């Protein structure tokens, strides 16, 4: 079950394979078949998806573009839905999905969160788990910076 998870917090995060290049028709078809009431965020792992036409397609469907940090992926600060979803994979370019964000980095992300909130968006931030426990520490620090 989902014990301890608020029902309004449930949604779907869809991740595209890093070899899956842009296919607007396929994305449009897929998103058009999802229930309108289920919040959806899409994480693209191929650079070809990062363009205004795809952002417009996501906006039409109310789907969020997943803003990413780390993992050698482009960090594009774009909100396409009533909520923003940020996936923080870790800042260490030598350690995939690892490392700890600095206090300065987390303050920078807190400012982005506040900007999206000022636009009336809910913001969800996910820190990629790692064996060193950095994700938990970073999430707690970000929450403290935001006063939550």
Regions found by a protein language model. Give the residues of each.
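Residues lining hydrophobic/aromatic ligand-binding pockets adjacent to catalytic sites
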Residues: 1-148
């Amino acid at each position: 079950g989902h014990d301890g998870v608020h029902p309004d917090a449930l949604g779907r995060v869809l991740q595209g394979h890093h070899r899956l290049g842009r296919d607007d028709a396929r994305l449009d078809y897929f998103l058009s078949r999802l229930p309108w009431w289920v919040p959806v965020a899409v994480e693209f792992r191929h650079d070809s998806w990062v363009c205004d036409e795809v952002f417009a397609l996501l906006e039409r469907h109310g789907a969020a573009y997943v803003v990413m940090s780390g993992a050698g992926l482009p960090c594009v600060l774009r909100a396409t839905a009533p909520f923003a979803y940020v996936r923080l994979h870790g800042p260490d370019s030598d350690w995939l999905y690892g490392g700890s964000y600095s206090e300065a980095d987390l303050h920078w992300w807190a400012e982005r969160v506040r900007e999206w909130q000022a636009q009336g968006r809910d913001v969800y931030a996910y820190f990629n788990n790692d064996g060193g426990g950095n994700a938990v520490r970073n999430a707690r620090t970000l929450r403290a910076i935001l006063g939550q």
